Amino acid sequence: MILNYLMKLFVSIFTLKKIPTLSWSSFNTLNLKPKSITLLYLIFGLILCGLGETILIAASAGVSPWTVLAQGLSVKTGYSIGLTTFIVSICVLCLWIPLKQKPGIGTILNTIIVPVVIDVSLPFLPTPELIVFQILQVIIGVVILGLGIGFYLIANLGPGPRDGLMTG
């Protein structure tokens, strides 16, 4: 009973009905000439997304579903995880066509920046052997990924390839 109450309280506190907009948010997802500050926040957010995913990969304790797909393809093909993430993103963008989804600048940059950050940063991150440190690394990765997603969504310059597929 108490647990049920606490869960409802938690959900009510952390539930957003729409993505917030800030002074630097784009007025339109298909804006082809966003403010420089909006573009900077978008790029910063996408770098954080890539870094968060990389930290999760390096922890070897579990990753997001799309990254599992990229990892599996990486193992089977011998390509890097970043390259397979890029290939998956392009394939997912092709699935937007029947949905009549339109990519924004954020969509294109997401397709490019996240895989590049994964490939550039992965060689520098440790893979902890102790489960305690793996869990700590996962927590850090999830927090960084969440912050990155927040920045890129608030920039409002188009969804990432996977987001657009799921919301289209």
Protein language model features and the residues they cover:
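Core subunits and conserved enzymes of cellular information-processing
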Residues: 2-168
